[in-house]
């Protein structure tokens, strides 16, 4: 059975991370002694670190501790009109959802890294802490930093974002590439006023380091009634935008982006599309 550590505070947890680095696996909300854990890993049960397990609501600001697992995120996330709940449910099936912590999903090597796509749409910020201090980064700056490598012992301890307006409609979808070589995901938000799309925002994660807004696709549906033609056209424009930025023209990737964006938009608009 792997060694299990039970820190009770963020400083204690940070010290363990600085000492053991990539040998660690953080878990929360499960019994690490009774569940199957990877061999060769030092298991850190962060259940006792209260700061990492809080979902805090202060006026219009939501803060979610990164120690919660994706199962809890799928059940209890708030202020995002169901966006993070959708994403957590889609990217992690029920068999593993309670084993994967939010902080593990924020690792670029994680198969659950698509949780960052809705975070970009929410314009979230990430709080980090290390043995040398604290800092807060925008989600885009965090994604660039974490891909290059965070400071030794540094840990994302919380994600915060502004509450969405109650009339904002949201959607998320993800598809996996054949052969297990990564994923494509999209997140979108908009208002629907008498079936007309108002102030749409669409974020796509595919071939680029940081999920990107596809403004041409947004323009295609803005101010127009929800319909299948606009959805299909927006998917095509989004694919073209992403492929141009990635400086490639891959027919398979183009199809995946088109499908992902269309499914995301359709999930928002389906009740408003004429039959």
Features from the language model and the residues they span:
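C-terminal structural segment of proteins
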Residues: 1-275
């Amino acid at each position: 059975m792997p060694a299990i550590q039970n820190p009770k505070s963020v400083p204690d947890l940070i010290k363990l991370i600085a000492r053991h680095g990539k040998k660690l696996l953080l878990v929360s909300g499960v019994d690490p002694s009774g569940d199957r854990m990877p061999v060769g890993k030092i298991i850190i049960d962060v259940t006792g670190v209260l700061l990492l397990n809080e979902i805090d609501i202060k006026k219009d600001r939501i803060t979610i501790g990164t120690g919660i697992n994706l199962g809890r995120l799928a059940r209890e996330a708030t202020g995002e009109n169901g966006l993070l709940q959708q994403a957590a449910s889609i990217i992690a099936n029920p068999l593993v959802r309670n084993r994967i912590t939010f902080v593990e999903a924020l690792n670029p090597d994680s198969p659950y890294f698509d949780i960052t796509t809705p975070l970009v749409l929410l314009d979230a910020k990430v709080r980090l802490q290390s043995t040398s201090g604290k800092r807060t980064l925008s989600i885009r700056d965090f994604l660039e930093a974490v891909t290059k490598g965070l400071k030794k012992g540094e840990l994302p301890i919380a994600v915060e974002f502004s509450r969405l307006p109650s009339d904002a409609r949201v959607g998320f979808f993800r598809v996996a590439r054949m052969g297990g070589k990564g994923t494509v995901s999209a997140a979108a938000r908009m208002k629907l006023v008498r079936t007309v799309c108002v102030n749409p925002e669409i974020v796509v994660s595919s071939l680029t380091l940081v999920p990107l807004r596809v403004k041409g696709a947004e323009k295609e549906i803005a101010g127009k009634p929800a319909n299948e033609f606009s959805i299909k056209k927006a998917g095509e424009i989004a694919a073209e935008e992403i492929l141009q930025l990635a400086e490639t023209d891959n027919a398979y990737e183009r199809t995946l982006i088109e499908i992902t964006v269309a499914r995301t938009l359709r999930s928002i608009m389906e009740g408003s599309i004429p039959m």
